[in-house]
A protein has these predicted regions:
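C-terminal transmembrane bundle of multi-pass solute transporters/carriers
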Residues: 3, 67-71, 75, 79, ...
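Short hydrophobic/aromatic, small-residue-rich stretches within specific transmembrane helices
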Residues: 56-63, 268-272
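Pair of pore-lining "gating" transmembrane helices in MFS-fold secondary transporters
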Residues: 10-42, 46, 119, 223-244, ...
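Juxtamembrane intracellular "pre-TM" segments in multi-pass secondary transporters
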Residues: 2-20, 199-233, 421
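Hydrophobic alpha-helical transmembrane segments
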Residues: 111-122, 144-202, 269, 321-324, ...
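Hydrophobic core of transmembrane alpha-helices in multi-pass small-molecule transporters
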Residues: 27, 109-127, 236, 319-336
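Small-residue hotspots at the loop-to-helix junctions and early N-terminal turns
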Residues: 36, 49-56, 150, 261-268, ...
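Short amphipathic helix-loop junctions that connect adjacent transmembrane helices
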Residues: 39-53, 247-262
Length: 421
């Protein structure tokens, strides 16, 4: 373990200025994102008194853009400079976020306003995420894709660990809408860090093909790649279930268990400790299991352990411990899974197709999330939060088991290059 951690911090990527700027910016943005996500839930639940169904709609709007423009965004990004796309998306996020505290100060904040901002942030996220995932192979080289993704995933986990706790503390001091100011400041730093990247970016490939033709080419590539398409289907199913779980957990904690927003933030923060450990130890799992079995094993364990969380309603005295421990274990395994499957996709995809491939997978993940969010809100209203959580966790476990039947699950080594047809 000590050797793994030491090697992680002394990797050649730490001498790559472009990657370090991207990494620093992403770390700040992830902290802000987590604070903003918690603040959004607190505003909807505590300030605007939204119902379970309205909360589901609000969560759905945050990812609706992936369903609407997810596929064309990939084709567009393939023809644009990725760094410029990320900067413009960051500036747009800042403007949208600042509107919330301004509306609150002038007593004009409504649920409709919050929903519009959620939708705009989702649109910015579409373009930023597609560009950022396509930018990593440009600045990190294919040799270090897995290491780069591991560090960026660690940034996500640092944000997930520190963001909710910081957000919960801030919610105890300020009104939820004012906490959005911190999120805006983190995006200011993130945008500045990306702007500081000086590494020349290759000119994007431009073709005379129409947008529809480019989208079809991307879809045909994913559909015809024997490793990608089965993985695509399983990831889409898992994302639907995960979106439902993410909507239901805050309701379980804040309403069913009657905890405070501060307690919710701390519980989410503790859970992310497992994610940081997962990013640090992923290479050991890869050496022992290979790519395929690492994806399957970590995915199944990571979602199955979440079944402990709804049982917390039957043990109020131990509820916080149950949610925290299951969150740590789940985050550990799902971080290893996420980094491994993302690195596999980037490794086997040709450079001119990265934007479209990433957009198609983002479409699969984020595009179905509005449906999962909405379905979970309706399910909770009909059968109760606890029962709804069991249903969505079972769906996630089923999707993970299905991954074991895909060709990707049979990759035994630590690289997929020799398996590309």
């Amino acid at each position: 373990m000590a050797v793994t951690v030491r090697a992680w911090f002394h990797h050649p990527l730490t001498r790559n200025s472009a990657f370090m700027h991207l990494w620093a910016g992403q770390t700040a943005a992830q902290v802000g994102f987590q604070v903003g996500t918690l603040a959004t839930s607190a505003i909807a639940i505590s300030v605007l008194r939204a119902s379970e169904t309205q909360i589901g709609v609000l969560s759905a709007l945050q990812t609706l853009a992936f369903l609407i423009v997810g596929l064309p965004a990939g084709a567009w990004v393939d023809g644009w400079r990725k760094r410029r796309v990320m900067i413009i998306a960051g500036l747009a996020r800042i403007g949208a976020l600042i509107s919330i505290p301004l509306a609150y100060v002038f007593a004009t904040l409504t649920l409709t306003h919050l929903m519009i901002v959620a939708a705009l942030l989702g649109l910015c996220t579409v373009f930023f995420d597609v560009a950022y995932q396509s930018y990593v192979p440009i600045i990190a080289s294919r040799r270090y894709i897995g290491a780069a993704n591991g560090r960026l995933e660690a940034s996500y986990q640092v944000g997930h660990a520190g963001g909710p706790g910081l957000g919960g503390w801030l919610l105890g001091l300020f009104a939820p809408p004012l906490v959005y100011l911190l999120t805006a400041l983190t995006y200011v730093f993130s945008t500045w860090a990306i702007w500081r990247i000086a590494t020349p970016e290759p000119a994007p490939t431009r073709t005379g093909a129409t947008l529809v033709a480019q989208i079809r080419e991307g879809l045909a590539f994913v559909r015809g790649q024997r490793l990608l398409f089965p993985l695509f289907s399983c990831i889409a199913a898992a994302a639907f279930a995960a979106a439902g779980i993410q909507v239901l957990l805050p309701i379980l904690v804040l309403r069913t268990l009657d905890m405070s927003a501060t307690q919710l933030g701390l519980l989410l923060s503790v859970g992310a400790i497992g994610g940081i450990l997962g990013a640090l130890t992923r290479s050991a799992w890869m050496k022992h299991l290979g790519i395929g079995r690492t994806i399957v094993v970590t995915s199944i364990i990571g979602v199955a352990v979440l079944a402990a969380q709804p049982t917390a309603v039957h043990a109020p005295a131990a509820a916080a411990a149950i949610i925290a421990v299951s969150g740590i274990v789940s985050s550990y395994f799902l971080t290893i899974y996420n980094v491994t499957q993302m690195s596999l996709r980037q490794e086997i995809c040709p450079p001119h197709m990265l934007g479209r491939m990433n957009a198609i997978f983002r479409f699969a993940v984020w595009g179905v999330m509005p449906l999962g969010s909405l379905a979970s809100g309706v399910a909770a209203s009909w059968m109760g939060v606890e029962a709804a959580m069991y249903v969505f966790i079972a769906l996630a476990v089923g999707a993970s088991i299905a991954m074991g039947l895909t060709p990707a699950a049979r990759i035994r080594g630590t690289s997929a290059i020799n398996t590309i047809p």
